[in-house]
């Protein structure tokens, strides 16, 4: 295989390598989204919201909540977290939850409850970049396209 042609193909199709890598690591992306929510942060790096009931906040913290005292983490029963998904279609990545409370929570706290802030993007990139490199290596080794 001609190295120049291979490199040109990679350059022209880098989006495909990246999207395939995101599909391959979508479960880890979902996990990173949950990790971000557990500390009570939204996609902008701000707190999701504040709990209005101080006693409830103390009970949540006593149960092992990771978020700072009084910060919303969107976790009560765990159903909302369990239903979080990451879906890649074409060049669009959707992170959401199939739980029935999703619309209510988005209206209350904003659609920015989904999506990674800069800190958690870095955490996810630590997973994603090696996968992109792996796909490129496979292509260079045996012509396996994403």
Place the predicted regions along the sequence by residue:
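Short, Lys/Arg-rich flexible segments
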Residues: 1-146
């Amino acid at each position: 295989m001609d190295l120049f042609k291979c490199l040109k193909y990679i350059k022209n199709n880098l989006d495909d390598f990246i999207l395939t890598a995101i599909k391959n690591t979508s479960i880890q992306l979902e996990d990173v989204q949950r990790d971000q929510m557990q500390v009570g942060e939204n996609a902008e790096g701000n707190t999701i919201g504040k709990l209005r009931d101080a006693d409830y906040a103390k009970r949540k913290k006593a149960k092992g909540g990771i978020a700072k005292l009084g910060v919303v983490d969107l976790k009560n029963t765990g159903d909302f977290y369990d239903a979080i998904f990451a879906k890649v279609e074409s060049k669009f990545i959707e992170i959401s939850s199939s739980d029935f409370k999703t619309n209510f929570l988005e209206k209350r706290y904003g659609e920015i409850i989904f999506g990674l802030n800069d800190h958690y993007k870095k955490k996810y990139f630590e997973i994603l970049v090696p996968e992109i490199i792996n796909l490129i290596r496979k292509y260079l080794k045996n012509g396996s396209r994403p």
